[in-house]
Amino acid sequence: MSSVVIYCRSGFENDAAAEITFHAAEQGFAGYVKAKPNTGYVIYECFDAQHGDEIIKKVDFKNMVFARQWFAGTLIENMPVEDRVGAVVEAAKDFTLCSELRVETPDTNEGKELLTFCKKISTPLKKALEKRNIVLREPKANRPVMHVLFLTNNTAYVGYSYSFNNSPFFMGILRLRMPSDAPSRSTLKLDEAFNVFIPEQQRESRVAAGMRSVDLGACPGGWTYQLVRRGMFVSAIDNGPMNDDLMQTGQVKHFRADGFKYRPEKRNITWLVCDMVEKPTKVTSLMIDWAVNAYAKELIFNLKLPMKKRFDSVYECLSMIRAELEKYGISYELQAKHLYHDREEVTVHLNVTKVPQSLYS
């Protein structure tokens, strides 16, 4: 497979293109990008036909900020309308046995118009693939996932991703329901972040009732809502007013203070969350200060992106975090993602696993 197909938010094609080019080159692969504005996907064409498969194995998908999903694939054009199933099966005849089939479209208005067609063709296509022993009847762990990305009703990229290095979600999107009692739609960003960044088997222990948390820039309480919902006690930091229902839970203490100046009196905070509108480097510096001083164990924060050079801006901030934490000998895990519920921003998760006591004692 010479092509790597990457799904992204419409309008972020240049950022996804810059990112795959960067990571492919870092692993020693060469190629070029094909991208059109507002299409919701980009194609990385490898100069070596075998390298598409190698890229989706060797580049860690968790390091891809702007990619919602990816797969190694090939383009099928002008499929006969009377036998599109046969055309897809023929293109996939040499695939390793896959655990499941995902028939998808780009997340654009044009793509959404194809979703009904995708659902309609999925059943006969899956049966045909099962018959040819290309896709299993029942999903099985640790097997590749087959993708068919329809661009039109007779044009599609057909390929596969590896279950250990992809997004588990259809179209790479985790869809969440807006709680009717949440103070703002921003609540979905933190809900998605917990689901994306924290492995399901660890969620109960790492995001647990009784934990102490801090929400910087909390007003009116969209992110605080998610912390309260999970049973945490929250210090909400904001000069603005908080939602009355949240305050009546008894789990929230409101501090009218500047989020950039506030620091906790004790180092007993498990979660720090922050969704303040400020320059990304300024927010990053604040988060580094909290991490280096062991004020919180895990941090989730948003970086508001500039109109241009969004890829450069994000990677500059991630490099700042790595450089500072490594300078002080701090052990950590770092991941960033342009989540489905994000807009002109990305969400970062920093898990501080060990801070030398000499830094803050």
Curated annotation (Swiss-Prot):
Query: What Gene3D superfamilies does the annotation carry?
Result: 3.30.2300.20, 3.30.70.2810, Vaccinia Virus protein VP39
The record's note on quaternary structure and interaction partners says: Monomer.
What family, per the record? Answer: Belongs to the class I-like SAM-binding methyltransferase superfamily. RNA methyltransferase RlmE family. RlmM subfamily.
Q: What Enzyme Commission number(s) apply to this enzyme?
A: 2.1.1.186
Q: Any idea which UniProt keywords this protein has? A: Cytoplasm, Methyltransferase, rRNA processing, S-adenosyl-L-methionine, Transferase
Q: Gene Ontology terms, cellular component aspect?
A: cytoplasm
Active site at 304
Which enzyme class, named as a word? transferase
GO terms classed as biological process: methylation; rRNA processing
Output the Pfam families linked to this UniProt entry.
Answer: FtsJ, RlmM_FDX, RLMM_N
Its job: Catalyzes the 2'-O-methylation at nucleotide C2498 in 23S rRNA.
Mind telling me what this protein is named?
Ribosomal RNA large subunit methyltransferase M
Q: List ligand-binding residues for S-adenosyl-L-methionine.
A: 186, 219-222, 238, 258, 275
Principal subcellular localisation of the protein: cytoplasm
What are the recorded GO MF terms, alphabetically?
S-adenosylmethionine-dependent methyltransferase activity
Subcellular location as annotated: Cytoplasm
Catalytic activity line of the entry: cytidine(2498) in 23S rRNA + S-adenosyl-L-methionine = 2'-O-methylcytidine(2498) in 23S rRNA + S-adenosyl-L-homocysteine + H(+)
